[in-house]
Amino acid sequence: MPTVALDTRDAFVPMPHGSGIYTRRLAGALRSTAGSDGLDYWFLERGGRAPELWWEQVTLPRLLRRRRPALVHTPNCFLPLRRPCPGVVTVHDLAFEAHRDDFSRRTGWKYRTITRRAARSAERVICVSNFTRDDVCARYGVDRDRTRVVPNAPALPAGSAMPPAGRYLLYAGDLRPKKNLLRMVRAWRRLRREGLEQRLVLAGRDFGVGAELRAAAGNEPLEMPGFVDDIGLDALMRGADALVHPSLYEGFGMAVVEAMVRGCPTVLARATALPETGGDAAAYFEPRDEDDIARAIRAVLDDPARRAELIKRGERRAAELSWKRTAAATVEVYRELL
């Protein structure tokens, strides 16, 4: 039975996000089908104290040569350039190319260099959206025939914690410049002055923009609780009047489908992968136009029939996505190389 080596080192960090959540859910789904799908799996975890780059490009290839799996899949963009078997790499987005100021010089250089080389050398490149696929092919000159689109799926476990009291709008994700939160806060403040009841909750780690956002909010009720665990995020989404996602760049937009699962209408930027993820189940705005952001939020909140329709469509859209389906599509990519 062929063995697939899966790099799972990002899955079990204390606060996983992005590729770590993807890896954890994919590994769980693959583990449940191991053997019955005709494949065995070797879940690799990083050990020791070697620098990350050394582990990726030296230690991991040694492990692969020792055990000789049929192929290796790295779900985090980082694929060993020298390997004894075919390689599959998942690319979630190229934000480090499109928004370089969001990354330190060292981190940005690492992601750009390793991801470019991995995408060009991999036998298959899995992209989480058609947008990311187009971006990878355009920026790195990757042959489209070597790419496959396999979308993400909702990953948050369902919980029963009580949502916060009162009415609020929610943003869930990192607080970074590319997330376009300043324009959203300004639009929300304008709505508050016009009588909007909802406060604004920005749930996520602050990467240097928090002070500016607080200043833009003035005396209006802006909450920034920082990193929120799965239980807390589930409760926040169930209680929100709407999820607003103003980002200028997303490779998929996990928060969108998480909100849809929980009956929370979504109001999204018409940018990058968000329209692909939201489809006809979301309301949209032009992300650089504060007036349009305010208009879209108000339109959803003031029209109960429209809001109910978005909730219904969102639940239907989210039901199309599951980790069982994502794993099955990923296995089909593996089979192309076996």
Language-model features and meaning:
Residues M1-L338:
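Carbohydrate transferase catalytic cores enriched for Leloir-type hexosyltransferases
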